[in-house]
Amino acid sequence: MVNIVVVGLQWGDEGKGKVVDWLSTNADAVVRFQGGNNAGHTIVINDKVYKLNLLPSSVLQNNKLSIIGNGVVLDPYALVSEIDNLKSSGINITTQNLAISESCPLVLSVHKQADILFEQLRQDTIGTTNKGIGPCYADKISRRAIRVCDLLDTKDLLYSKVNHLLIYHNLLRKSLNTPPIKAEDIVNELLNIAPKILPFVQPVWKTIYNLTQQNKTIIFEGAQGTFLDIDHGTYPFVTSSNTIASQAWVGCGINPSNKSYILGLVKAYTTRVGNGPFFTEQNNDIGKIMFKTGKELGTVSNRKRRCGWFDAVLARQAIMLSGVSGLVMTKLDVLDQFSEIKICVKYKYGDKTYDYLPASPHIQSNLEPIYEILPGWQTSTFGSVSYKDLPQNAILYIKKIEEILKVPIHLISTGPERNSMIILNNDFLQ
């Protein structure tokens, strides 16, 4: 089995957790390479629901190494809580099946408070999860972040680093008439949590290098989706990390000569959590049906996901950005009720049409979708595992999307359970 990079091609919530869990059955290791606990993956096994935020989806499999790469910003308390929750469900997390990069920046309480303060200052709120992700990445770029490796320092050295961090944050807080944070409080938080984190810490880049030298199979698990990418997304309504496939190499330290198969995920329709442009959004009964049938609530925020028709313009651009070779379509069954189904094939702005997403926020806010309309099938596909047994109009829809995107669909998910999967082509697994 080749190494596989799994990325979302929309605004996240494409079902990456389920697919990575399914793929990891035949893999040796799974790596998270960006984001933090602002991303959520939901996996259903034998009717039991597991919700993961920081841990790779492979933790639910036996004898798999789960790796948190340097591109992840790590909330140590959230991680320990997640580990404890899994242990209470009978999933044992040990130093044999979890590795954490020593270079991960740590999300601290000061970052979560800064997140809330910044959001209050904005004229147009982004819709952040208030998990402190953006401020932590900002500290990383500004070279003042506290990293996992700093937990190995003496108390005095750690205090010095925290004090340096708080020079910036307390200046910000002072300008907003907010009380300062004491370095002692942050240091004590870190010293309390360090013993629970440090046993898992190692030079992850070296661990991954050794795995590649042994021809082990690695899956790189993306979080969020292409159009939340800090550079390529619907800026400023984006996350604070790069979410496209190339981040997999940077976010864990694997060198680019290790070629991987890029597997892109799309829902059969489109959803988005939080604010920002959404070109095919359905603020009507159609959107309500998608929301209810798809159970579209954010795993982390529990916010309602906005719902709309499949946007082939976005998907096609995401395929180009990540070099996607094959697709997984999820939640096909959510479309079962509709008599007709629309696919956005272009955008219109004034008298101009676009076959890509312009970068300008002003233009984005005024784009109108141009649709191609297909007949619905109004027959249940829920839980289907056979392509030939799908309704003909469902097959027509699948083939139309392949035709527009010029990339084959390998897998189709028809329900939340691990094995609710139609396999069209598994050659990419060889």
From Swiss-Prot:
Positions that bind Mg(2+): 13, 40
Cofactor mode of binding and number, as noted: Binds 1 Mg(2+) ion per subunit.
Keyword set includes Ligase: yes
Cofactor: Mg(2+)
Subcellular location: Cytoplasm
Primary location: cytoplasm
Enzymatic reactions: IMP + L-aspartate + GTP = N(6)-(1,2-dicarboxyethyl)-AMP + GDP + phosphate + 2 H(+)
Pfam families: Adenylsucc_synt
Binding positions for IMP per the UniProt entry: 13-16, 38-41, 129, 143, 224, 239, 303
Pathway annotation from the record: Purine metabolism; AMP biosynthesis via de novo pathway; AMP from IMP: step 1/2
Annotated GO biological process: 'de novo' AMP biosynthetic process; IMP metabolic process
Disulfide bonds: none
Sites where the protein binds GTP: 12-18, 40-42, 305, 331-333, 413-415
Stated family: Belongs to the adenylosuccinate synthetase family.
Role this protein plays: Plays an important role in the de novo pathway of purine nucleotide biosynthesis. Catalyzes the first committed step in the biosynthesis of AMP from IMP.
Protein name (database record): Adenylosuccinate synthetase
Originating organism: Ehrlichia chaffeensis (strain ATCC CRL-10679 / Arkansas)
Gene name of the record: purA
